[in-house]
Amino acid sequence: MVELMALLLIKEDGSGKLDANSYATAADCDGYHDGHLYATAWTGATQSKKEAALVMATRLVDSQFQFNGFRAHSEQALQWPREKCPDPDASLLTISVLGWVGDNFVEPDLVPAAVAQATCEMARELLIVDRTAAPAGEGLDTVATAHATHAATGTSSDSTSSTTKYNKSDTRPIISRVAQAMLSKYGALVDGGSGAVRLVRA
């Protein structure tokens, strides 16, 4: 019998680790969720559940978003740290006829706080529901219609028919709207898509 090894969370600290699998630690997220009004799913989870959620959240962030610039190290495991990724919050900016110049890039030896915070936000969401799972139906609504037979026909049987239609507005984004807002300053969803899975409302 093969014994599975326990998950080991390895935080990316900005050095471009080859084996990093998370942008934040459970302790980082404890601090992020401190005072969060709806943090019960996180605060009530075990340490192992928290770390598993963080690793999965990091995978989703990296797979669903393409960040600007390029990886700081060719062999690093995650998308961050990055070179030449514009920083909209940089304080030293100079405008020239050639565009933005000066110290307006995210430092190539760090992970932006917003990326770590978005990872924490997604980890909490994943402890509530698997955002990668599309429920049965894949966005298809089936409406049943009952047809009562008129008394004049002399029969008492009823019949039922159903109509199936696709509800394009019935979707759930894989990356939550809150996390998307945090990450969008540094990049965009892959292929400009919505990053959503289809839902069926009960």
Enumerate the predicted regions with their spans.
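Divalent metal-cofactor coordination and adjacent catalytic microenvironments
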Residues: V2-A202
